[in-house]
Swiss-Prot record:
<comment type="function">
    <text>Assembles around the rod to form the L-ring and probably protects the motor/basal body from shearing forces during rotation.</text>
</comment>
<keyword id="KW-0574">Periplasm</keyword>
<comment type="similarity">
    <text>Belongs to the FlgI family.</text>
</comment>
<dbReference type="GO" id="GO:0005198">
    <property type="term" value="F:structural molecule activity"/>
</dbReference>
<feature type="signal peptide">
    <location>
        <begin position="1"/>
        <end position="19"/>
    </location>
</feature>
<protein>
    <recommendedName>
        <fullName>Flagellar P-ring protein</fullName>
    </recommendedName>
</protein>
<dbReference type="GO" id="GO:0009428">
    <property type="term" value="C:bacterial-type flagellum basal body, distal rod, P ring"/>
</dbReference>
<dbReference type="InterPro" id="IPR001782">
    <property type="entry name" value="Flag_FlgI"/>
</dbReference>
<keyword id="KW-0732">Signal</keyword>
<comment type="subunit">
    <text>The basal body constitutes a major portion of the flagellar organelle and consists of four rings (L,P,S, and M) mounted on a central rod.</text>
</comment>
<dbReference type="GO" id="GO:0071973">
    <property type="term" value="P:bacterial-type flagellum-dependent cell motility"/>
</dbReference>
<dbReference type="GO" id="GO:0030288">
    <property type="term" value="C:outer membrane-bounded periplasmic space"/>
</dbReference>
<keyword id="KW-0975">Bacterial flagellum</keyword>
<dbReference type="Pfam" id="PF02119">
    <property type="entry name" value="FlgI"/>
</dbReference>
């Protein structure tokens, strides 16, 4: 019986205090990706490229490329091309990226091309913010969208003016790294939290000895490491696999004003309150009335007059009681009981916070 109670208590403690690895909560300062950008041409399009009369930069780029290949285009030539498109190419240079390694690239049309499906990106240099070329991109573009048009009607699924080339760029220049230099490294928390920063520092000190780690602020933990790349790699591997108990997060509600979505974490609670929500709808109907003369040869004229009707309706909302809720499930039930739409729920949550009934931070993105 005692063994059973001990196992039950251990299970409850483990469930209440969830342990996570340090590597899932932090990142090493300075070990990050770097953005690359380039300008290039896509060829081989099936008549869906730029209208060169409206995008002169496409023609200029093509002339420059042909001249580099030893082909001279006569001055004043007006090339009417439909299978070429000017594009912007973006990629991310990974940390510790080595020469010869391949990375993915994203290709996006910058002209009036209708689709990049079936196109091939010609060799495009990718530069960093220092204007140095770090990679070269080239390859066939994979477009996730689809579309068709005929007789003035068209249908489209997803985007056709952007695509991706898997392993489409080769790294030609390595980015200098400061890893392995010095005897300290900084771990950065994904979300600032004073208690979590101190808890990670205490965990490292218990395993590696007092003074091995110091919490500098709510996001940064400074760690003393041995000198040399190989020693620091082994040291960081051991630290990142350590487990810490995750403290409860701040109660937060995130509202996306563009899509109307509402997301909240499990720490959100409600106090008792009363809510009344009314709906206001405006309906506009417009019809065209056609008036024709009675006699076909009487010299009359057909007249089209628009007729507009506006209807304004307001539905009153009854006052409803919202009970105090201490768990996420109860919060969801209480809000669903109001019968409000997501857009109405955004206003209700803002009013609840102003009234002091919503125990959470409200973030609108």
């Amino acid at each position: 019986m005692i063994k059973f109670l001990s196992a039950l208590i251990l299970l409850l403690v483990t469930t209440a205090a969830q342990a996570e690895r340090i590597r899932d909560l932090t990142s090493v300062q300075g070990v990050r990706q770097n953005s690359l950008i380039g300008y290039g041409l896509v060829v081989g399009l099936d008549g869906t490229g730029d209208q060169t009369t409206q995008t002169p930069f496409t023609t200029q780029t093509l002339n420059n490329m042909l001249s580099q290949l030893g082909i001279t285009v006569p001055t004043g030539t007006n090339m009417q091309l439909k299978n070429v498109a000017a594009v912007m190419v973006t990629a991310s240079l990974p940390p510790f990226g080595r020469q010869g390694q391949t990375i993915d690239v994203v290709v996006s049309s910058m002209g009036n091309a209708k689709s990049l499906r079936g196109g091939t990106l010609l060799m495009t240099p990718l530069k960093g913010v220092d204007s140095q070329v770090y990679a070269l991109a080239q390859g066939n573009i994979l477009v996730g969208g689809a579309g068709a048009s005929a007789g003035g009607s068209s249908v489209q699924v997803n985007q056709l003016n952007g695509g991706r080339i898997t392993n489409g760029a080769v790294i030609e220049r390595e980015l200098p790294s400061q890893f392995g230099v010095g005897n300290t490294l900084n771990l950065q928390l994904n979300d600032e939290d004073f208690s979590m920063a101190q808890q990670i520092a205490d965990t490292i000190n218990r395993v590696r000895g007092y003074g091995s780690a110091t919490a500098l602020d709510a996001r940064t933990i400074q760690v003393r490491v041995p000198s040399g790349n190989s020693s620091q790699v082994r040291f960081l591997a051991d630290i990142q696999n350590m487990h810490v108990n995750v403290t409860p997060q701040d109660a937060k509600v995130v509202i996306n004003s563009r899509t109307g979505s509402v997301v909240m974490n499990r720490e959100v609670t409600l106090d008792s309150c009363a809510v009344a929500q009314g709906n206001l709808s405006v309906t506009v109907n417009r019809q065209a009335n056609v008036s024709q003369p009675d006699t076909p040869f009487g010299g009359g004229q057909t007249v089209v007059t628009p007729q507009t009707q506006i209807d304004l309706r307001q539905s009153g909302g009854s006052l409803q009681s919202v009970r105090s809720s201490a768990s996420l499930n109860n919060v969801v039930r209480a809000l669903n009981a109001l019968g409000a739409t997501p857009m109405d729920l955004m206003s209700i949550l803002q009013s609840m916070q102003s009234a002091g009934c919503l125990r959470a931070k409200l973030e609108i993105i």
